[in-house]
Amino acid sequence: MAMAFDALGHEMLIPSSDYKITHWPNPPVNQFVWNTEWTDEMVKKEIKTDNVRVVSKEEILDIKPDVVFVTGYENQFEVLRELWPFLSGTSKLAFYSGNDYWEDAYPWYMIENYLCADQLAVGLCQKYEKRFLNYRPWIDYDQFKFKENTDGNILGSYISEYDKTFPKEYEFVKNLQSECGYLDFRINSHSTKEETAKCMEESVGTIHVKGLEGYGFAIIESMACGRPVFLHRELAEGKSYMNWAVENNTALFFGNALEFMAKSKALVECKEYRHFVQKSCSITIRKLVNNEQQTELLGIFLDELL
């Protein structure tokens, strides 16, 4: 998001590590509101643009940002109850959805503008007649670029806190790992962008088995590297990434272990097929997810906030 805002000439403010959170969500998700570790040093290390500032609660209220984003169910309580009463006269309010939450998790009663990263949010915005943009995140195509075809048998997975957040899907992949001895599964649950890019570069593809749709970074980044993504057909149904998951190009769909084994063996054992899919994958995704086009749409969305 910082790169998209930078392209539009906007500054992004994020709560600093000394921001004292007052309003937490209800159990069982009340252990998290947002990342509370941001410092100036961390921003310089993690973010490539110069348009990001970490600020305290007092600074946010003093600056009065043009737009205040709720970025998830977990932090809507802090934003709406602690900040918005003091900013409602000067700022616009929007919700950036990056996980397909349940219907009542969204503050329909209060927020009119929605930046949707998942298909469920799009459908719900249509139902509640809200203003929305089905937005694709800015992808760093320079960092996640196609360098060369790869051989070998490494298959990567890049789902944060996989075993804790999605235990059933994690167990499914672990079972595949035990059944498919010809593959070297690399399950990365805490990797940095640099570590993710390195693993993708070394791998032949990615496996992404998850019932909940997120922002979509890992899937698109893998495709950008020329690493097709194995997707569980049933779990992928109705997800927004189906718009760029092209069978035998950017994605390989499977419904059970046998189908996964057949398709993964073909990818590993047939060099001509593997190299064709990897190269075409990296080309196709750049056509389907275009940073400049998405940023232009984001600019229009921000200019026309209700």
Question: Can you say where each PLM-predicted feature lies in the sequence?
Answer:
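C-terminal "capping" alpha-helix adjacent to the active site of nucleotide-linked donor transferases
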Residues: 252, 256-273
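Short hydrophobic beta-strand element within catalytic cores of glycosyltransferases
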Residues: 228-237
